[in-house]
C-alpha cells in the first residue's frame, strides 16, 4: 500500500511520501540503540518531566493536531480533539505512576535479601493502525518511554502526517532524537526490521492476519510480542436495564469512529421481553444519524477511512444478506465524493454469515433476540474473538454472571467498552495476547530480574 494522505471525506490525495530506504532505516536503528543507552539511565523524575512536556504540547496544539487526524482518516473533528486530550492524560498518568509501578518487589525467601527488579530491554517496534492514529501510539509510547525503553513506530500507510507529527512532539519536548522515531516504510519491510537484533520486542495493534504474521516472525526470533487484534464485541441488554440509556449507548457504541474500532459493539443480544421495543428505537436512532463532513459540528457519522474499507464493509453486508440476514436500514454506499456508508442494521443474521463471524469495521449492527442471560452468553462467546463485552442489567446476580462467564479480556456492566490508562487493555482468544495500559502494560516490555543476595 502506498504511503499517502488521502482525505476520506473527499477522496482527494493530500500528500504522497517515499518509503525509507535501507540506509535510512539503518541510520535510525543506530540512533535508537545509542539513545537507549542514555535514556535507560535517566531518572524517573527526568523522564516524567519530559513526558509532561509532551502532554503540555498536546494540550496546547490539540486543534492543529486534531485537524491533521481528521484530514487523514476522517474522524469527526470533535472526536479528534478528544483523542488528543486523552493522549495528554495518558502521558500525565504514566509520568505520575510509572516509578511506583516499577518499584522493586521484595520477596520472602531463605536469602538475606531477595527481590524482583524491573529493567528496560531496549528499542521496541510499534506497528500501529490508523483508526486512533494518536491514541494507539501514545498508549504504547508513554509507558515504554517512562520505563526506559525507546520506541520505533511503523504507522499505517494512510496516516503518515500523524506519524511524523508524533515523532516531532517527542523531539520538541526534549527527548533524545533517537528515543522515539517514525519509520515511513512499507509492509514488506517489516519482517526484516523484526528480525534485526537491535529490535528487542514488538507490539502491534491491527488485524488478525497482520498479528499472526508479525507474531510468527517475532516468535522465530524469540522476541516478546503484545498483540491487540480484532473484536466482534457483544452488547447485551436485559429487561432490568435502564432502557433509554441502553438504546442510546448502543447506537454510540456501534457508530463511534464510524464503527471503526476494535472495541466497538458489533453484535447486539437483546432479551426477548424488550426486543421489539429496543429494535424499534435502535433502528430509528440509527436511521436518523447525520452523515457528512467530519469538520461540521452537527455531523454524527463521518467517512470510512479508505475506499478499500468501504468496499469491504459493503461486501460483508451483501454476503450476510445473501446468507439470510434481513436489512432494516442502510446497506448502501452514499453517492458522491468520499467514502461514506449508511448506518446499517441487520436482523435474522445466520451464524455462518460475515456479520456474525467476522469483524465488521464500519457502522453495521447485527441484532439478535435471546431468551435469557444464558443464551446471550452462549451466543456472545460463540466467536473466535474475545476483546471486550458490554452487558446492561441492574440485576446483581446477572451482573456477576456476565462478569464471570463472558469470554473476553474486558467486561463493562452498564457502560460502553472503552480504554482507560488506569486499566489493562487486551483480549483473549484471537483478539490478541498481552496487555496495554495500567500497571500491566508498562511491565510487558521489562526484564523482570530476580535478585538473590545470600
Where do the protein language model's features map onto the residues?
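Conserved C-terminal structural/oligomerization subdomain of aldehyde/semialdehyde dehydrogenase
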Residues: 10-16, 199, 236, 290, ...
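N-terminal Rossmann-like NAD(P)+-binding subdomain of aldehyde/semialdehyde dehydrogenases
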Residues: 1-113
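A short hydrophobic/small-residue beta-strand
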Residues: 150-152, 327, 410
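ALDH superfamily catalytic-core signature
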Residues: 14, 209-350, 379, 413
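Short, well-ordered beta-strand elements within core beta-sheets of diverse protein domains
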Residues: 15-20, 35-41, 126, 235-237, ...
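Rossmann-like NAD(P) dinucleotide-binding subdomain of oxidoreductase/dehydrogenase enzymes
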Residues: 59, 103, 107-245, 370
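Structural signal for hydrophobic packing residues in well-ordered secondary-structure cores
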Residues: 36, 40, 55-62, 66, ...
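Residue-level signal for inorganic ion chemistry
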Residues: 11, 32, 47, 69, ...
Amino acid at each position: 500500500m502506498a504511503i499517502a494522505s488521502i482525505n476520506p471525506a473527499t477522496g482527494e490525495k493530500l500528500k504522497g511520501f517515499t518509503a525509507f530506504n535501507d540506509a535510512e532505516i539503518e541510520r535510525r536503528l543506530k540512533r535508537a540503540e545509542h539513545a537507549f543507552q542514555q535514556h535507560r539511565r535517566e531518572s524517573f523524575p527526568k523522564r516524567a518531566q519530559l513526558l509532561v512536556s509532551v502532554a503540555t504540547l498536546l494540550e496546547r496544539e490539540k486543534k492543529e493536531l486534531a485537524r491533521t487526524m481528521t484530514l487523514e482518516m476522517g474522524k469527526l473533528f470533535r472526536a479528534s480533539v478528544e483523542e488528543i486530550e486523552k493522549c495528554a492524560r495518558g502521558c500525565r498518568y504514566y509520568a505520575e505512576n510509572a516509578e511506583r509501578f516499577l518499584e522493586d518487589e521484595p520477596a520472602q525467601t531463605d536469602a538475606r535479601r531477595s527481590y524482583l527488579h524491573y529493567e528496560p530491554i531496549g528499542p521496541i517496534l510499534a506497528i500501529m493502525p490508523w483508526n486512533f492514529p494518536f491514541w494507539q501510539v501514545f498508549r504504547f509510547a508513554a509507558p515504554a518511554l517512562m520505563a526506559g525503553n525507546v520506541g520505533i513506530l511503523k504507522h499505517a500507510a494512510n496516516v503518515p502526517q500523524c506519524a511524523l507529527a508524533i515523532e516531532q512532539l517527542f523531539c520538541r519536548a526534549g527527548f533524545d532524537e533517537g528515543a522515539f522515531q517514525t519509520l515511513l516504510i512499507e509492509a514488506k519491510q517489516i519482517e526484516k526490521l523484526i528480525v534485526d537484533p537491535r529490535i528487542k520486542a514488538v507490539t502491534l495493534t491491527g488485524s488478525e492476519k497482520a498479528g499472526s504474521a508479525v507474531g510468527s516472525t517475532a516468535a522465530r526470533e524469540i522476541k516478546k510480542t503484545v498483540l491487540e487484534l480484532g473484536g466482534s464485541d457483544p452488547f447485551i441488554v436485559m429487561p432490568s436495564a435502564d432502557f433509554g440509556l441502553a438504546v442510546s449507548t448502543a447506537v454510540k457504541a456501534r457508530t463511534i469512529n464510524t464503527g471503526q474500532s476494535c472495541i466497538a459493539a458489533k453484535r447486539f443480544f437483546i432479551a426477548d421481553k424488550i426486543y421489539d421495543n429496543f429494535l424499534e428505537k435502535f433502528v430509528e436512532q440509527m436511521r436518523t444519524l447525520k452523515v457528512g463532513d467530519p469538520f461540521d459540528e452537527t455531523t454524527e457519522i463521518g467517512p470510512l477511512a479508505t475506499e478499500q474499507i468501504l468496499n469491504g464493509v459493503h461486501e460483508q453486508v451483501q454476503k450476510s444478506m445473501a446468507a439470510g440476514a434481513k436489512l432494516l436500514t442502510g446497506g448502501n454506499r452514499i453517492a458522491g465524493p468520499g467514502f461514506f456508508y449508511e448506518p446499517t442494521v441487520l436482523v435474522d443474521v445466520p451464524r455462518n454469515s460475515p456479520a456474525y463471524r467476522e469483524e465488521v469495521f464500519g457502522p453495521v449492527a447485527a441484532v439478535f433476540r435471546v431468551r435469557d442471560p444464558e443464551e446471550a452468553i452462549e451466543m456472545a462467546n460463540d466467536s473466535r474473538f474475545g476483546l471486550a463485552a458490554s452487558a446492561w442489567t441492574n440485576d446483581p446476580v446477572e451482573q456477576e454472571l456476565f462478569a464471570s462467564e463472558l469470554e473476553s479480556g474486558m467486561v463493562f456492566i452498564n457502560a460502553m467498552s472503552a480504554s482507560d490508562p488506569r486499566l489493562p487493555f487486551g483480549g483473549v482468544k484471537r483478539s490478541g495476547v498481552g496487555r496495554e495500559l495500567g500497571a500491566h502494560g508498562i511491565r510487558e516490555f521489562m526484564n523482570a530480574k530476580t535478585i538473590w543476595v545470600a
